[in-house]
From Swiss-Prot:
Pfam family, one: PRAI
Protein name: N-(5'-phosphoribosyl)anthranilate isomerase 3, chloroplastic
Catalytic activity: N-(5-phospho-beta-D-ribosyl)anthranilate = 1-(2-carboxyphenylamino)-1-deoxy-D-ribulose 5-phosphate
GO terms for biological process, alphabetical: L-tryptophan biosynthetic process; response to UV
GO MF entry, a single one: phosphoribosylanthranilate isomerase activity
Listed EC numbers: 5.3.1.24
HAMAP family documented for this protein: PRAI
Transit peptide: 1-32
Any one annotated GO CC term: chloroplast
Pathway membership, UniProt: Amino-acid biosynthesis; L-tryptophan biosynthesis; L-tryptophan from chorismate: step 3/5
SUPFAM superfamilies: Ribulose-phoshate binding barrel (SSF51366)
Protein's organism: Arabidopsis thaliana (Mouse-ear cress)
């Protein structure tokens, strides 16, 4: 897993946007993105422009625009900036061995800022057991828990009945999935995050997974392009895809 700050971009199948700065609704097509693609009838076009005051109103979050998740937030101040910029999910690393790990008290402050701004606080856990995760989630007022590592994922079936869950699948550099979603309760996951720690393109290997998945999906990688994501959406016909 990556322990630095990252951003996840939720994509609707006909609207593709990558951003390093800020974002706006797609209805007026005004953007301040590093690059933008808009997919319609399987055609791809790109444009760049600038705008101001692009942070969405709370009522507009998730409507006809990308959903963004910022991860690795370490302070309430940074969380406020992320929310102001339009982030929909604020991720915090609770795992103590990360250089960006934070205390539960700081996580609670971040959660409060996120919720007040209309965003959802997410806690990242690695190799933690059920009780540890639930205690931390309660203490920090988390909306979702993100499960990395075998120990954390082993508690999924119990956790998903208590909390909203982002279930993490790992992929190697060749795009092969190294673990699977549990058959019994996998459909209960709120999000699936496909994590490629080494980056890499794994489109072909994951198309069948996307096509069969009934969950929202995050993709984590370093070599995604607008064309590649457009291709993924068109070929897999998934409802939603996200990029880290």
């Amino acid at each position: 897993m990556s322990t630095g700050i990252s951003s996840d971009l939720h994509l609707h199948p006909r609207a593709l946007n990558f951003s390093k700065t800020s974002k706006s609704g797609l209805s007026n097509r005004k953007v301040s993105f590093s690059s933008v693609g808009y997919a319609q009838n399987r055609k791809l076009s790109c444009s760049v422009s600038s705008t101001e005051n692009v942070a969405p109103k709370d009522d507009d979050r998730g409507k006809d625009r990308p959903l963004v998740k910022m991860c690795g937030i370490t302070s309430a101040r940074d969380a406020a900036m992320a929310v102001e910029a339009g982030a929909d999910f604020i991720g915090m690393i609770i795992w103590p061995h990360s250089k960006r790990s934070i205390s539960l008290s700081v996580a609670k402050d971040i959660s409060q800022v996120a919720r007040e701004g209309g965003a959802k606080p997410v806690g990242v856990f690695v190799e933690d057991d059920e009780n540890t995760i639930l205690r931390a989630a309660d203490s920090s007022d988390l909306e979702l828990v993100q499960l990395h590592g075998n120990s954390s994922r082993a508690a999924f079936s119990r956790l998903v009945r208590e909390r909203k869950v982002i279930y993490v699948l790992n992929a190697n550099e060749d795009g092969k999935l190294l673990n699977v979603v549990p058959e019994e309760d996998g459909h209960l996951a709120d999000w699936i995050l496909v994590d490629s720690a080494t980056g890499g393109r794994y489109l072909d290997q994951l198309l069948s997974f996307f096509a069969l998945s009934h969950c929202n999906v995050f993709l984590r990688g370093t070599s995604y392009t607008i064309t590649l994501v457009h291709e993924t959406v068109c070929l897999s016909q998934v409802t939603e895809i996200s990029r880290v």
